[in-house]
From Swiss-Prot:
Keywords: ATP-binding, Cell cycle, Cell division, Cell shape, Cell wall biogenesis/degradation, Cytoplasm, Ligase, Nucleotide-binding, Peptidoglycan synthesis. It is found in: Cytoplasm. One of its GO terms (cellular component) is cytoplasm. Belongs to the MurCDEF family. It catalyses: UDP-N-acetyl-alpha-D-muramate + L-alanine + ATP = UDP-N-acetyl-alpha-D-muramoyl-L-alanine + ADP + phosphate + H(+). Gene3D superfamilies: Mur ligase, C-terminal domain, Mur-like, catalytic domain, NAD(P)-binding Rossmann-like Domain. It comes from Aquifex aeolicus (strain VF5). It comes from the Bacteria. Its EC number is 6.3.2.8. This is UDP-N-acetylmuramate--L-alanine ligase. The keyword Kinase does not apply. Pathway: Cell wall biogenesis; peptidoglycan biosynthesis. Cell wall formation.
Length: 454
């Protein structure tokens, strides 16, 4: 009854991938939605088409008659719309709390982990859609099949990423908790790795008695947490005695084919639709969820063999002088290593030309040596300036130093990056634009520019 009194939501930072997904679900549920952001993008355009009122720029008057204000983690407390909402005693809640409210309306499958959340969530969504379960879906990237990152389903299940970056995933009350891996990430929030581990342990143990957790047993941190857990846990892995296991793996056409074993029984083989050993793990997580929900192996196999990456996950964007040009969101050393290995599986005899834009001063500072270790193995590397993502450089870290220690060429801005790509490119190279900041737009602009030159 009390919940039904709310009719109008306002989102500050509505263009972000996580915010836009929740806003879209609320629109499809019949709520009125407005929102603001500093610039227009694909997400704001789609929401506008669906009936949202979108404002460019943050102003107090944008709130209109909103009854609840939702803000993203990128929004500062002194934002004029937050200040106006507080002045008018309008509830102001973080994105994670709004997602938690949606979880109360469905049986939630929350996918967490330092890496692989978007791909794993997308795989689970594809399988459940193909199984006719009509899930509600909220993903941190556009699912090719849906053409969007969110969809309201008529079924009882909600599949969503669970963002650990600010601890908000602990607000969720999922029936199924998936953890892909645990890494040294978001140390600006957690301060140390022990706190990261504690948060994931709490998340794993948050499932109700009728639910279950799905956990990567090959991850050493998670293997330790599983030993301590009293909840029902479905483990998966390749090298460990997990309940869901990939066996007899081999590369075929640049992608892995593997046998699937569940609780000691061989179910059949899958030739995964996308490259990379890390995606075998993501597929095993999705398989574990689906099997426990009663989905047939035939549906799982078909879904994973036909699966294509979500947007910005090793996405082929075009060609430069017959060289394929890829775009990828990877911004952590573990993710960079995974995407580089995937490309080497796909193009074993080619050189890789990588343009890397570090994301956040804090991440670059805390993981500096890890970045150097993974970047120095790249054939041709161009490093550009750090994308701040609302941070100030209080760490004294520099992209020039990262480039120097990694044996890379440094290019300070977009124009210089394009110039350097042309300089170092050779026939047959595979080109990758890599990072979580503006580098994706640069990739598109580079391809437009070179196509105009033809």
């Amino acid at each position: 009854m009390l919940r039904e009194r709310i009719k109008k939501f306002h989102f500050i930072g509505i263009g972000g991938i996580g915010m836009s997904g929740i806003a879209q679900i609320l629109l499809e549920m019949g709520y009125k939605v407005s929102g603001s952001d500093i610039s227009e993008n694909k997400n704001t355009k789609l929401l506008k088409q669906k009936g949202a009122k979108i404002y460019i720029g943050h102003r107090p008057e944008n709130l209109g008659d909103a009854q609840v204000v939702v803000y993203s983690s990128a929004v500062k407390p002194d934002n004029p719309e937050i200040q106006e909402a507080k002045r008018r005693n309008i509830p102001v809640i973080p994105r994670g709390e709004m997602l938690a409210e949606l979880f109360k309306l469905k049986e939630g499958i929350a996918v967490s982990g330092s890496h692989g959340k978007t791909t794993t969530t997308s795989m689970i969504a594809e399988i459940l859609i193909n199984a006719g379960l009509e899930p509600t879906v909220i993903i941190g990237g556009r699912l090719k099949r849906l053409g969007t990152n969110a969809k309201l389903g008529r079924g009882e299940l909600l599949v969503s990423e669970a963002d650990e970056s600010d601890g908000s995933f602990l607000k969720l009350q999922p029936a199924v908790a998936v953890i892909t891996n645990v890494d040294k990430e978001h140390l600006d929030f957690y301060e140390n790795f022990e706190r990261v581990k504690e948060a994931f342990e709490q998340f794993m143990n948050s499932v109700p008695f009728y639910g279950f957790a799905v956990v990567n047993l090959d991850d050493p941190t998670l293997a330790q947490l599983v030993k301590k857990s009293h909840e029902r846990v479905i483990t998966y892995g390749i090298n460990s005695p997990a309940l869901v296991r990939a066996k007899n793996l081999y590369l075929k056409e640049g992608r892995y084919e593997f046998g699937v074993e569940f609780k000691g029984k061989e179910l059949g083989r899958i030739h995964l639709g996308i490259a990379g050993i890390h995606n075998v793990y993501n597929a095993l997580a999705a398989t574990g969820v689906a099997l426990e929900l009663g989905v047939s192996f035939e549906v799982i196999k078909k879904s994973l063999e036909e699966f294509r990456n979500a947007e910005r996950r090793l996405e082929l964007k075009g060609y430069y002088k017959n060289s394929p040009v890829y775009d990828d969101y990877g911004h952590h050393p573990t993710e960079i290593k995974a995407v580089i290995n995937s490309l080497r599986d796909m193009y074993p005899d080619k050189n890789l030309l990588v343009v890397f834009q570090p994301h956040r001063y804090s991440r670059t500072y805390y993981l500096f040596e890890d970045f150097v270790k993974v970047l120095k193995d790249i054939d041709k590397l161009i490093v550009t300036d750090i994308y701040p993502a609302s941070e100030n450089n209080v760490y004294g870290v520099s992209a020039e130093e990262l480039a120097r220690k990694s044996g890379a060429v440094f290019a300070k801005d977009k124009e210089e990056v394009f110039e350097k790509v042309r300089e170092v490119h050779d026939e047959g190279d595979v080109i990758l634009f890599l990072g979580a900041g503006s580098i994706s737009k640069w990739c598109e602009e580079f391809l437009k520019e070179v196509n105009l030159e033809k």
